[in-house]
Regions:
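Bacterial N-terminal signal peptides
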Residues: 1-10
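Short, solvent-exposed loop/hinge segments that bridge or flank secondary-structure elements
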Residues: 28-61, 65
């Protein structure tokens, strides 16, 4: 999730053969924003069978911007890797790249890189490393 005045990015997925296990997932993220590293954040996420079976949709970016227009995200799935690219133009120009490696049906790693510019000036440079692991059934 991006912080500050950047649009809200919700990790949210239409995939081909790529699927993961439904259930309760522990998602750990570490963010470096403008050179400052945050402490790891750990969150739980319950994935339904529908969400787990449609990884490209579940993990695609969804943006909400004010005074900026976003193009539909371009995405590509190769083997067990999902990559996407989102661009928004307007008062805030945003360029976001995501790469998710689903190394097993119960584990993935990802990197999301975001650069935000206003009037051509870089105002936000964010890199988030993510690890997700299935920890059980949803409660």
């Amino acid at each position: 999730m991006l912080l500050c005045a950047l649009p809200v990015l919700i990790v949210s997925a239409e995939a081909s053969d790529l699927a993961i296990e439904p259930g309760d997932w522990k998602v750990t993220s570490t963010t470096v924003m403008n050179g400052a590293t945050s402490l790891p954040a750990v969150k739980g996420r319950c994935l339904t069978p529908e969400q787990a079976g449609d990884v490209a949709k579940t993990f695609a970016p969804v943006s909400g911007t004010v005074n900026s227009t976003c193009e539909p995200a371009a995405s590509e799935t190769t083997g067990r890797v999902l990559k996407w690219h989102l661009q928004c133009k307007g008062q805030l120009d945003l360029d976001v790249l995501g790469s998710f490696n689903f190394d097993s049906p119960s584990h993935y790693t990802a990197t999301v890189i975001s650069k935000g510019r206003m009037a051509g000036q870089l105002i936000s440079d964010v890199k988030t490393d993510i690890e997700g692991e299935r920890v059980g059934e949803c409660q």
